[in-house]
């Protein structure tokens, strides 16, 4: 379903902090006051020019520096293609290495996001290489809709591991990704169990209360302490459930994206939530009729 840009913007305002780092700081500070952590992300991906990748690298370092100076409870998320992976693998790895090295200097953390499946191998290789030098300052993301995910967990050596586990949002062929929501959910819990077996720290990224319930059963099964895991949610999604999780004493982190390149991100959120897209369209048309 094609969604016109004005409607995407109308809907997407609730999912992004704004267009500037100042906006991300403001939103993060508000979350911190509610005992909620944040991970800040500069929107943008699929960079094809080295100067643009270097710009994003410097902006990521600026985000980390600002987090440190402002005393925020937040870390950084970034995408490998934003760092130049489409241009050159080693160039992108060097950019990420520089960011993670800076994060180590200020005792912070960088999450290497997972993009569509053609980048999965390189993303995991980046994580494996960076983990050797910065074991406590870098993590990556695994997606339960990918058939390969349990084997990817097995491929990582024991030791300090840090994952975000989510369902996945990119449109992938059936031979690569499960299409049945039930199987995706089952693979989510199966993968989470494997991660806990390896004593990994996991950001359990879901708004599905059934998955949260099953995750809590695994947390109890393994006798995990509150500092051994966290839940993660998107900005602007099911704040009632978010507050329930926090009030129960669990750590929770909200994804706080900002930047000029909000369109692609907002479109993905709409495609992931077609019912919300229809609701946003109705609201938009209602406002148009009454203005």
What are these regions (language model features)?
Residues 1-291:
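Positively charged, amphipathic and often flexible ligand-engagement surfaces
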